Amino acid sequence: MDPYAFSDEAWCKELGRRLDHLREDRKMSRVELGEEIGVSQPTIRRLLDEGHGKLSILVAALRSLEALDQFETFIKPPPVNPALLRKKQVRRVEVG
């Protein structure tokens, strides 16, 4: 499957669909999810059915569904540059 063959809107809807499937797997209702993350049912509907919503709501939903670990596969963290790491360690020693 070519991921670039789909529109941004199609990907947003797919993300909402996958999040809704995860919610069902956790045996959590939409009402429970909304209450747990502090958003209204229209907001949950827009997120799960249409793929529209703020990133902060997406992160809160992933946390509520105990799925934040899946975020690592969504966007991989950048590799650590050993030279920069040493430089930061030296600064901590100098400042500390």
Task: For every predicted segment, state its role.
Residues E72-G96:
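Short, charged recognition helix plus adjacent turn
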Residues L19, R30, Q41, L55-L58:
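Helix-turn-helix DNA-binding elements, focusing on the entry/boundary residues of the two helices
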Residues E36, A61, F74-P78:
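Short acidic/histidine-centered micro-motifs embedded in hydrophobic/aromatic stretches
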Residues E50-R63:
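Short, basic-rich loop-to-helix N-cap that marks the start of a DNA-contacting helix
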Residues R17-L33, R91-G96:
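Short basic helix-loop element that most often maps to the first helix and adjoining turn
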